[in-house]
Amino acid sequence: MTVETDKQTLGFQTEVKQLLQLMIHSLYSNKEIFLRELVSNAADAADKLRFEALVKPELLEGSGELRIRVDYDKDARTVTIDDNGIGMSREEAVSHLGTIAKSGTADFLKHLSGDQKKDANLIGQFGVGFYSAFIVADQVDVYSRRAGLPASEGVHWSSRGEGEFEIASVDKPERGTRIVLHLKEGEESFADGWTLRGILKKYSDHIGLPIEMRKEHYGEAADKPAEPEWEAVNRASALWTRPKSEIKDEEYQEFYKHIAHDAGNPLAWSHNKVEGKLEYTSLLFVPGRAPFDLYHRDSAKGLKLYVQRVFIMDQAEQFLPLYLRFIKGVVDSSDLSLNVSREILQSGPVVDSMKSALTKRSLDMLEKLAKDKPDDYATFWRNFGQALKEGPAEDYANREKIAGLLRFSSTHDTTGAQSVGLADYVSRLAEGQDKLYYLTGESYAQIKDSPHLEVFRKKGIEVLLLTDRIDEWLMSYLTEFDGKSFVDVARGDLDLGKLDSEEDKKAQEDLAKSKEGLASRIKAALGDDVAEVRVSHRLTDSPAILAIGQGDLGLQMRQLLEASGQAVPESKPVFEFNPTHPLIEKLDAEQDMDRFGDLSRVLFDQAALAAGDSLKDPAAYVRRLNKLLLELSV
């Protein structure tokens, strides 16, 4: 290395300072993870060089043998990670090592909890593993030169992790990046060949290019060669190209951690080779936890794409639908050209066929997880259930398959857990039941005792309880399952079909006819606030209820539209009353029109509250209620 020039001292971005403090104070409970992160970055640099060299072969500078070298010096207390990948220019070193360029930095820091294990996962997901070097090092030196730049445009970046870094220009004949870690006192154990080999074998055996270390020579010093001999300490073959029978679960798990930047294990994986008209290999994973930015519009999604084992791009979104954006993995195709671009991937029979097959394979993987490991599937559902609920709207062809993977709360399970599958629900249908009943609301606590459920409890009929904000929208696309239609128990004039006997139906009609006068009086009292007033067939214990018009938006959809600033179509509820309830009998007998109006209004407002809606004029409700209570106390 020659004399340094153009030396500057620069400050870290504020967010990096915060991150460094977390790292330095042992955020990772497992310190050896630093080597996995730095080797993973070196492998990415090799992938990027391979890809850019497809168009500019001169970037290889006459040497296409890509490798990573890990070395150590016990006396100097250093560990060195050296790669001959793409390298960095001076500007890139400042940008990549001095700032966190990825969007959502504030969100990332906001999600840090102080829990070492959880925060370590976040850091991996966020792709800032370079800073893990400061867990074991009190100084980090980076020497780099971008492929294609002259030797004189090498760069030396150095920092002690204390808020600033130095950067200077140096001569660097070889392209790529060399990172020298000056180990802290107490971390000398990492400057050891046996230790480093063990860590590399544990975390990086799946890396698809050689990770080399110096051969260890024992015995007489005279036997040592003048020049160091390097040997690969990993398999150096892409994991997905190996036969499934030869790959251990631990290898799949470490490969997942490498591509997903996740410290936890996946819940499931599927490794498949397709031969014939199309030829490609896929390795797909279901993560064990959701990234914090799963629902951000610009969150990282898609598979790593390789063509004939040459890395093409991260986050190729074209091979899976958006509702499966949580799936991680690799697809390696023999049918795409090496100069494929994102634009070319937008359409075409090859991509469409691969997308269809990979979607089916992902859903099959989830079906198997649900069947074989229900506890793990419950974990999956807690993390990704709402994303999967987008499926019926996006993927008509797989609607029934997706529906079978959905989980809901129901009146069958009093815990409120979303654990009921539609197949389970269908298996418990009452005799004569040909509809699938559901009720939407803000929370399980809010709707578990809803008046809308009274007649179903009386008849012993299970009702699905849908409490996610997306649920009402979901049900506008998911209209049937197993040949049976879904029915919202809060919508329209409830018809229980064969669940009501002919005698029951005749009695309901006669009762409704006998109360037409009362219905007209209540309608006059409530005026334009209701679309209709009628006798209810839903109620057994409550005096009144509000039903949604058959074509109107429910409360969830209205709230979603309001929250997004969109216009909400005006709709009026249907007021239904229970003619056998003592309060309704008292109302029917009331001759004082003012008092009748107040009673009708109080019943209307109470029905709105029971439905989870807010009152337009809560002060008027309280005033009327107080007035009626005073009259009762006289």
From Swiss-Prot:
Residues 560-634 are annotated as: C. GO terms for molecular function: ATP binding; ATP hydrolysis activity; ATP-dependent protein folding chaperone; unfolded protein binding. It is found in: Cytoplasm. Residues 1-342 are annotated as: A. Keywords: ATP-binding, Chaperone, Cytoplasm, Nucleotide-binding, Stress response. One of its GO terms (cellular component) is cytoplasm. It comes from the Bacteria. Residues 343-559 are annotated as: B. Coiled coil: none annotated. Molecular chaperone. Has ATPase activity. Homodimer. Belongs to the heat shock protein 90 family. This is Chaperone protein HtpG. The lineage of its organism: Bacteria, Pseudomonadati, Pseudomonadota, Gammaproteobacteria, Lysobacterales. The gene is htpG.
